[in-house]
Amino acid sequence: MKDIISRHKAGEHIGICSVCSAHPLVIEAALSFDLHTNNKVLIEATSNQVNQFGGYTGMSCDFRDFVNKIAREVGFPSERIILGGDHLGPNCWQGEPAAEAMEKSVDLIKAYVAAGFSKIHLDASMSCADDPVPLDPAIVAERAARLCQAAEETATDEQKRHLTYVIGTEVPVPGGEASTIGSVHVTRAQDAAATLETHEAAFRKLGLNAALERVIAIVVQPGVEFDHTQIIHYQPEAAKALSAWIEGTPMVYEAHSTDYQSRQAYWALVRDHYAILKVGPALTFALREAIFSLAQMENELVAPESRSRVMEVIDEVMLNEPGYWKKYYRPTWSQAMADIHFSLSDRIRYYWPHPRIRQSVEKLIANLTETKLPLGLISQYIPVQFERLSLNELAAVPHDLILDKIQDVLRAYRYGRAI
């Protein structure tokens, strides 16, 4: 990370795409995409995905071993993987008193650092049960400093060579917006400056001067966001003052919720010093598109009694267990079903680990692996992949088609020079 940031600050048009997903096919797609380059691949886990209690993926910081296992299968060198932790702080424990939530947050940070995660987002921006709303920025900074102190005490000297921190409080809701958005507030330059100033003071108060040298980025809102049905696109002019301010610091910006922006927007974001671009739902949205397309092919090619019924299984599970989508999607039945299937916030992603859904996806892939896929069907349902088949760049097998569909998202970031 430090090398990429140094190159950017030296004037090179370079950034990095942060892959925020715990889905094995997304991780495999990201590693395969850069298998034959010298690029680093940044893979991040959020605190609600991976924590000391398991998170919604059921994984603790053994997520590192999970990623490394996929890397070995792909043939990707583990030394080219950067592991990051996103929203590390009280996010998962906002319903608890601050003292208890922070105690768990400290343990969370220690677990991530001990496991070898080297990019740490110190996010203490959320109010806990006994906190005022919103939380005083000075309190946010003090709590972030306490989390940083835990990281510094845990890291070995070797780990500190690679350890980096991201600070900042203007973060989109972890997991996605719960309502529709009409517009988005671009962070003011003076607010970014205040964030840095309060964090520097809090760090120094705890004697964390050396740790300050490891702070590489500030999270801000450059004016990009999406909800279930719409996208707020980057407007460089609206963020002009913010983009200029960071040039006077040794840091860059980190932008969250950059999913679904145009290729040209990624190029402009990197140019304007939003050098760490986070993507998550767009990757699993592409995965979902590929699986739905393959399900349509299965209906054409496989006898009814042998089909995976993957789409029906997804519906059954999500309707029986609505906890991950109910408060986010529209209440009318037809609208809710459209959201379940096609929402840009892609809350299906929380259900892929479910045993019934996982088994049905495995059966879908097995069924179509045993069946020759007609080119006409591929053209009908995934035409971009059909073009690559025609150029002999891709094999007509389900696994490869899914990976390539996910990699279409990564290609847009690569166009913007987010390696």
Curated annotation (Swiss-Prot):
Keywords: Galactitol metabolism
Any one Gene Ontology BP term: phosphoenolpyruvate-dependent sugar phosphotransferase system
Pathway(s) the chain acts in: Carbohydrate metabolism; D-tagatose 6-phosphate degradation; D-glyceraldehyde 3-phosphate and glycerone phosphate from D-tagatose 6-phosphate: step 2/2
This protein's record includes keyword Lipid metabolism: no
Gene3D superfamilies per the UniProt record, alphabetical: Aldolase class I, putative tagatose 6-phosphate kinase domain like
SUPFAM superfamilies reported for this sequence: Aldolase
GO cellular component: plasma membrane
InterPro entries, alphabetized: Aldolase_TIM, GatZ/KbaZ-like, GatZ_KbaZ_carbometab, TagBP_ald_GatZ
Induction conditions: By galactitol.
Role according to the record: Component of the tagatose-1,6-bisphosphate aldolase GatYZ that is required for full activity and stability of the Y subunit. Could have a chaperone-like function for the proper and stable folding of GatY. When expressed alone, GatZ does not show any aldolase activity. Is involved in the catabolism of galactitol.
Protein name (Swiss-Prot/TrEMBL): D-tagatose-1,6-bisphosphate aldolase subunit GatZ
Source organism per UniProt: Klebsiella oxytoca
Lineage, broadest ranks: Bacteria, Pseudomonadati, Pseudomonadota, Gammaproteobacteria, Enterobacterales
Protein's gene: gatZ
